[in-house]
């Protein structure tokens, strides 16, 4: 019934105007699954390889014709005839066909496109929504949105070093109310920034990208916006940071340079800097607080703040069970950011989430800075019982599409659904 009968691919554009891969998989029932692959701006060194053409005369070298050709000429002949419902076997076939640790032969963008499209085709053939097909009967938890309303770092042209400042509406009763809360704070922040004469253009993920004096000023204006929107900081709305520290780490000197503030820290100094921010503001989560290979400082950070805050490994773990296993063994971080294109297949993504949950780590389903209208991660957040999702601000359709899909899922679940709310973070207390 769900035998794969055809696989095709094409080059489309993502939210930054860069090419990406879109794949369609058809199964014997006549159902077709379509998936578009996201792309990151700040990427971890240990991520699976996103195959680009490198032809500078076309899309500045970022074309994906090679990856598209690999889907059509290499992957399709190997998977036609396989059962799309057997996700593990399908993904294993593609991984073996590639034969490299980072999927550099065929491209993680090629493999992932087929992996996700096949899951969608199988779900449709079985008459199930994707979240139910992947997550089973128990998939009913709507995630807390970590809404990136102010951008810095690699996501914006400004002097703010921390990459993302997020509002976390954890004290609301439903996902719909949490989303409304985040949107109202987003609009209030625009007024606050305008009042200060700051720019209100948005960055890659839909958050404002003003030029502010310091990271702390960014936190202060968000706190003001929360109040102006009529919400209570700490009780109804918390804050989260994605520091993307690998972007401001000087590997040779072993120092962290916050150029926008004129500050330079060793590992211990950086940890104390975060501790001071957490003591002053209602921060519940810090992502990538240290460089992806600075395990010693990660350990210091976890020992200092791990009992109080969610410490999320993104570039640190890259959705990879080998790196996550090392983190668990060493007691580093207490949460994993989940990005399907970091590892390059649905099966491996699910394995990483399961490993994290078994170890008592939380998980945060995440978009990339280069997105499309594809809403797969919204379904996966519910399917994997992540309890949290990062998919940008309350602007840009590529971000809103995921939130709208979660609204549909919440409506479909009705009384059986539950909003994770504060419970998504309570395991850390």
From Swiss-Prot:
Cofactor(s) for this protein? Mg(2+)
UniProt: (2R)-2-phosphoglycerate binding residues:
163, 339, 368-369, 390
List the GO biological process terms: glycolytic process
Q: What's its catalytic activity? A: (2R)-2-phosphoglycerate = phosphoenolpyruvate + H2O
What pairs make up the disulfide bonds? none
Catalytic residues in the record? 205 (proton donor), 339 (proton acceptor)
MF term (GO), any: phosphopyruvate hydratase activity
Major place of localization?
Answer: cytoplasm
Which GO cellular component does the record give, naming just one?
A: extracellular region
> Which residue spans adopt a coiled-coil conformation according to this UniProt entry?
none
* Keywords in alphabetical order: Cytoplasm, Glycolysis, Lyase, Magnesium, Metal-binding, Secreted
Family membership noted in the UniProt record: Belongs to the enolase family.
**Function of the protein:** Catalyzes the reversible conversion of 2-phosphoglycerate (2-PG) into phosphoenolpyruvate (PEP). It is essential for the degradation of carbohydrates via glycolysis.
- PANTHER family membership: ENOLASE
Name-wise, this protein is Enolase
State the organism of origin: Anaeromyxobacter sp. (strain K)
